Amino acid sequence: MRTLGAMAIMLVVMGTVIFLSFILRSRDILCGKTMKSHVISAVETSQLMVDHAVYNTMKRNLKKREVLSPAQLLSFFKLPESTSGAISRAAEIMETSIQVMKREQSQFSTDALSADILGTIANLSGCLPFMLPPRCPDTCLANKYRPITGACNNRDHPRWGASNTALARWLPPVYEDGFSQPKGWNPNFLYHGFPLPPVREVTRHLIQVSNEAVTEDDQYSDFLPVWGQYIDHDIALTPQSTSTAAFWGGVDCQLTCENQNPCFPIQLPSNSSGTTACLPFYRSSAACGTGDQGALFGNLSAANPRQQMNGLTSFLDASTVYGSSPGVEKQLRNWSSSAGLLRVNTLHLDAGRAYLPFATAACAPEPGTPRTNRTPCFLAGDGRASEVPALAAVHTLWLREHNRLASAFKAINKHWSANTAYQEARKVVGALHQIITMRDYIPKILGPDAFRQYVGPYEGYNPTVNPTVSNIFSTAAFRFGHATVHPLVRRLNTDFQEHTELPRLQLRDVFFRPWRLIQEGGLDPIVRGLLARAAKLQVQGQLMNEELTERLFVLSNVGTLDLASLNLQRGRDHGLPDYNEWREFCGLSRLETPAELNKAIANRSMVNKIMDLYKHADNIDVWLGGLAEKFLPGARTGPLFACIIGKQMKALRDGDRFWWENTNVFTDAQRQELEKHSLPRVICDNTGLTRVPVDAFRIGKFPQDFESCEDIPSMDLELWRETFPQDDKCVFPEEVDNGNFVHCEESGKLVLVYSCFHGYKLQGQEQVTCTQKGWDSEPPVCKDVNECADLTHPPCHPSAQCKNTKGSFQCVCTDPYVLGEDEKTCIDSGRLPRASWVSIALGALLIGGLASLTWIVICRWTHADKKATLPITERVTTQSGCRKSQGRGISPHKAAAQDTGQEPASGSRVLLCE
């Protein structure tokens, strides 16, 4: 019995252990399946939320195309291009997915959100491909021309400086929740015991000045701030959220004054004269894997705070001319040209010279112009080219300069392929951007002492320097230029005097109006005004004119924007540390008291206003603090912004493998020629001006301070003539269809490197080498890529049908849906389908036919009754009249009267002919 009892107990224990083991294993399996399904569900839910918000945004924009509000206009022109948009959408889906999981996290253990789960979320959301390093090509071409995306400039860090990567952080960001919420998001959050002042209050009390009160710069021309804006658009664009509606709840950001991501509205004071309590503001897109997304990587909430993305290459590479992605570059190039030209406008000329081509988007209309005749915006490497005529003029100058250079290079080197001529011209244009910026522009901004301290002489490429544009530079320091924008656009005649037919214009009358350039004199009057009229001087107490603080992007009476408030709010959105933190970063003393602040600002009244608003010196927004500082000697910035701008410019120069002064980028002789060139020379070669100042940025009087274009030095392009002997065994082949090649040397041998146009895939050898027997392989071919076959990352939204075309694809909508502004999503147009109109028309015809038939039947019946009561003679007469009237256009009634020789009597019966 004891043995049986012991065996029974043993069996029970073993059974219990096995049962518990089974239960635990099953729980792990079940929980694993539950977590996986939960992740998939969270991502699917988030994708629906984000896409629904984006869809509603595009639908609202479609309905409001006639009159855009300033906020809509700003949002539209900060829309990311295709690649940037895909990254922004993926980041928003990933961030929303993690928010969904955080809200439901009580159902799961905290440690369940592992790196594996996060990898799954990154993959399902579409973020993962944009977080991996790109593959760098290993060809001689990779060392000859910079890639359009900026990737692989640094071979060890291929994403440094590339487009669609996160802005660099020189100091950790400050977010109210530690990783994502902007400064000022929570109204009860205190900084050193005080809430931050509303940005609109800061603008009104410290920044804004009337147009009449501005002081003009006695040293520098209006070209100085315009060049600064142009260069800023070459190196930085922070895309806004792809949606202007909240992801949770879908409320329109223009209709809410609550903080609901991505809505972060600018609150207006209670005594504001406007009809709304806030101005719309949309948060910048997060970079993939940061903010709420980064909060769960390793479960370290502060390990990877929210970062913002730069949609452009960081490098000074003339991306304003060529774009920062293959898709944009494809739109800009003239693929039918054998000389590697850029596309030009086919509808308008400027005294025989080219304008920028038109984009598909319509800009602000000329008064009284119907929508169908609205002038489109200009198409350039940067989407903001049409903001103001001066900016469009500079873009146009460089379009013309590229085509001038490419044509000359092709004439000098007839054996060059179209792609070689294009790349060589692009290389020179990029070098000229670097020279004009670093030699002529930046020293005037920093002053000689700060330039020597922070930039200094060039000592060669340094692969340890990260050239990525920093958040503080893009979001604060380089926005100093907004305080130098003049409220007037001055257009001058050939004598550089006020143009009688082209009067001065206020800025509000030129925003996004390219028709003013085309229909009102072309480039020359604008360029003369930039050269011969002064910039606005940045003066404490006169920081920004009211055209920018009260009338920004105003096209109608449907609202306004305030650029100063936008700058301050953007800094808080990006979590920029305060003014004193950045002074300490630059080795400058912290300023804690009004007396200390007055040493840097040197304006007691402004210091008092700052302290009244901010209450504590460590609360001051960095953009305001840097802007308010007194200038350094010979500079146009104070010490803080001189430090930040100088450090950034040095990084852009020293961290760029393709910097024009770097060894092997150009020959020694070519570098000497490049140094001769200047912005005035570019103006001489590409406008109708015959006299220019030697320095385009210095204000001068005409004619004594202007030189003849014949005396302005220029490059000798003969230095680009290729003289290497071409072996008869290796004659340059014909260019491949839908592709091109460039040539270079590798180990002393001639090499051809082939590439296909965007939308085509290379099949065969990418690189062909010249040997003793000729080319070592046949040229490759370029095959069309069927983008529609990609089911993993479909190019069109599910609402659209994908149609493959040669080198591209089209997203097609069924009536009454139309493509949204992303050209991938079908939006309900709000009108009846064409088929419905056809049905209505057919129905109307059917009803009309039935009515006519009914009328004829009734008339016949009535006529038959009348025939029975008429005398024989009357009946015969009437029918006779009807027969006579046929074919002559005479009414039967009148014909009957003619037969009797009488006019028809009033009120007599009119008989119907059969």
Swiss-Prot record:
Q: Which PANTHER family match?
A: OXIDASE/PEROXIDASE, THYROID PEROXIDASE
* Protein name, UniProt field: Thyroid peroxidase
Q: Name one GO cellular component term.
A: mitochondrion
Cofactor binding mode and count: Binds 1 Ca(2+) ion per heterodimer.
Cofactor dependence is on: Ca(2+); heme b
What residues are glycosylation sites in this protein? N123, N271, N299, N334, N603
Q: Which amino acid positions bind Ca(2+), per UniProt?
A: D234, T313, F315, D317, S319
Q: Which residues lie on this side of the membrane: Extracellular?
A: 32-834
Q: Provide the active-site residues from the annotation.
A: H233
Pathway assignment: Hormone biosynthesis; thyroid hormone biosynthesis
Q: Site described as Transition state stabilizer, positions?
A: R384
Q: Enumerate the spans annotated as Sushi domain.
A: 728-783
Task: Report the residue ranges that make up the EGF-like domain in this protein.
Answer: 784-827
